[in-house]
Amino acid sequence: MSSTSSHYRGDIDGLRFVSILLVVLYHAGVTRFGGGYVGVDVFFVISGYLITGLLLREYRSTGEINLVDFFARRIRRLLPLAATVLATTLVIGGWLLTPLQRTSLITDARWASLYGANWRFGAQTAEYTAVNPTESLLLHYWSLSIEEQFYVLWPLVVVIAFWAVRARGARLQTGLLLFVTAIIVAGSFAVAVANAIQLVPGSYFSSFGRFWEMGVGALLAIAAPSLQSLQTPRNRAPLVAIGLGAILVAAVSYGAQTPFPGYAALVPVLGTAMIIVFGANSSASAEPRSIDLLAWGPLPALGRLSYAWYLWHWPAIGIALLANQRWDLGLGTGVATFAAVAVSFGLAWISHHLIENPIRLAHRLSASTRPNFALGAALMLAPVIGGFLFLAAGNTGTTTVAAPAVITNDAPSSVAPSTTDAGNSRAPRTTPTTTAVAAPETSLVPTTLLVRAMTPEDAANDSVGQDRPALAMGACFSSFEDVEIAPDCVFGDENGERTIIAIGDSHMQHFLPALHLAGEENGWRVLSWIKGACPVTGASLWSNQLSRPFHECDEWNENLLAALEGVEADGVLIARAFQHQERLVDEDGQILEQPEGIAQAWAAGHRDVHDQLTERFGTVVVMRDTPRAPHNVANCLSRNPTETSQCGFPAEGHALRDTILFDAEVRAVGTQHHLDVTPYVCESDPCQMVTAGGVIKYRDTQHLTGTFSTTLAPVFSVLLEEAFFQTT
């Protein structure tokens, strides 16, 4: 937009500083800037504008676009610093993390080095607003990956558009490029909006769902000569202020619950567009750029550090929090975070002057393209090769704690009924007696359910995290978006004369291996329907995964109750996670925070479902939730393979954290049958996470491994026989 020989705009660098500051404040947990993630959207628009302007100027001055030279410049500009941060994070993070977390970090690094990090995190359906730096030290590479994908594809679009009408003149070439860009922007924006409305998991990281933001910047660069006429000395300052205000309003008013990107992304994107259009000093008569707010004083210089600061700040925060936790430094989370932010800014300044600029401006690299591509290949492949070597070296040093256990060795040798009727006060748990129950024969364990018992050494390669009940996956497990009831989910003895209905969320799912074996042994049919994060209740909940009220859970519960009207069974077993008390919402979809409101909402919802099921099936048994570990058990065991007791935790307190829900249920229905298997999950206090036979109990903080669940089959044989089939 400038007619001068220099195309540098200090206001854009100043805007870069504002953008990175918003991102850093958001990542630092400053609640006032809950929408600070829009800073990335500002970067996207700026990138599209600058890159397109660069390509157009080259074509207008030389009559061609040298793609080889373009990609060589991108390599010099982006890869050296990105690789430096990647390598530093791998070394320090690998030292601080558990072996299991280290494996995940190396995988993240491979994707980041190849600029596919957004696909990696999108495939994991990660929620950007729900991930903290300690969970993924390289999550921030998602945006760099999308930008690099744009940098690879966009020059090709420009070249093809210009080549297609090369004989028709510059005006038609520009018109065609403008038309093609508008089509891409419209299509990409439509995808982004559809993803936001449908809450498609992982869509935050979608490449095509983000290209429209860079496309808007490209449109501004293509239409720059025409847009200059919109400027006047009187409208520049107020319109730039409005654009900046739009960005800041989004940063302070958006949050984790904002469907993004979609319509909401228009605010920061259009705000950035206004700054780009009206911030340009297009004529000598316009006021000097020095009075522009974004070009004031140190802002442009700080903005030139934005790329380096963005790269350093996220892993710095994560490493600081990990170190504070590992060595118990006694620093508050806020202190550790802001210390890391300060350090990351220092690293940004140093690396900008010692790595980024020297390599970008190196005469030897700019004189020939070949060294640039050799450098780029080396920087991109180093983390990939290094990761493989690191994992290979780590696997050779794995320590075995115990041989894989035979399931019969870990099954309780004696089990006493612990189903209890609860009135207005919770009845005491029955102490185990000497009622003998034979452990299931090994032949009862299906090979699809259990290949072998997990041992602590498996924690180092995520075998524990993947030890899920295979028989409960697939069509019989409804995901977050599902509302239909799956047919024919039959476990246990399919021809059994007695039938138990087992329903609930993933905390029912982790009991299904035990129920399946108990059903086979005792001649019970077990009909099961499960939906992730969705308890069987008439109360409405918030979905952390979908970042909105969980309407699909409401609909699924309604469909489930309707489907059960045509089912014949001897009773219903319900299991659910205790943390649902943190997710109840009112009629307006607002999360309930007061215990009284939580209890009332849960009581009303439970009474509605309990009454319907009791009237239909007679006996309804609600399982108490199993203890929740204060740490990820698989991670802990991977760090302490020879000292597994370090991963135990006090069962009392954790085991009864569902008290609010349970007491509300009792008050709602007067009397409730409940079943508690905590004494068999935690035979001692602290609750140990590895059995005497070497079977790991938990695969994360709350879910039992499929292997350990099978060892509970004798327990369920006794408890369910007493609950559903014994007459008094």
Which ranges hold each PLM region?
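Membrane-interface helix/loop caps of multi-pass membrane proteins
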Residues: 1-390, 726
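Extracellular/periplasmic envelope-modification machinery, especially enzymes
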Residues: 256, 324-338, 345-353, 357-728
